[in-house]
């Protein structure tokens, strides 16, 4: 039986944010929710997640301009350990479904920079470590992940900056 985990990378609300790029920092905020006691799981953040936030390393416009458009760079790994799903249920869990959403415009795999006066031409992307699948943020990318009642499952991702086009980034006032 499949159980849906409603969380980013285990979450489905518009909770991913590409804000703060105007202040030389960027955060990917990840909020999670698992509901219904009969279908619940224990979800533990791993990697560089700290209170649901992945802090990306500062990138300069020179560094960003040297990268190819659409490519992840200055990445950070994060993930979730999922275990103890539907403990005691008569219907064992064999898979979890991961839904992701966020603000994207021209490319569903790139989160828009929504910071006030933020840098133009740069966003944030996330990809699954196991197969380098780029996550889409428009709700179209439902990913099924295997689950073992004995071992649980590890959801592993990497996130980083992405140039959104070939034009050079310009410094923000």
Predicted regions and their residues:
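Mature extracellular/passenger domains of Gram-negative fimbrial/pilin and adhesin proteins
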Residues: 4, 20-173
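Gram-negative bacterial Sec-dependent N-terminal signal peptides
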Residues: 1-22
């Amino acid at each position: 039986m499949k159980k849906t985990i409603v969380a980013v990378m285990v979450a489905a609300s518009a909770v991913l944010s590409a804000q703060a790029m105007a202040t030389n920092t960027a955060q990917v905020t990840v909020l999670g929710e698992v509901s219904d006691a009969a279908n619940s799981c224990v979800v533990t953040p791993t990697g560089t997640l700290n209170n649901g936030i992945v802090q990306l390393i500062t990138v300069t416009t020179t560094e960003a301009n040297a990268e190819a458009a659409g490519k992840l760079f200055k990445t950070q790994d994060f993930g979730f350990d999922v275990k103890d799903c539907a403990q005691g249920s008569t219907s064992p869990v064999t898979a979890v479904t991961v839904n992701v959403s966020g603000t994207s415009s021209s490319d569903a795999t790139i989160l828009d920079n929504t910071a006030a006066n933020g840098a133009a031409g740069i966003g944030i992307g996330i990809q699954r470590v196991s197969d380098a699948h780029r996550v889409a943020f428009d709700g179209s990318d439902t990913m099924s992940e295997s689950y073992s009642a004995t071992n649980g499952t590890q959801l592993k991702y990497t996130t980083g900056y992405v140039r959104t086009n070939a034009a050079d980034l310009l410094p923000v006032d």
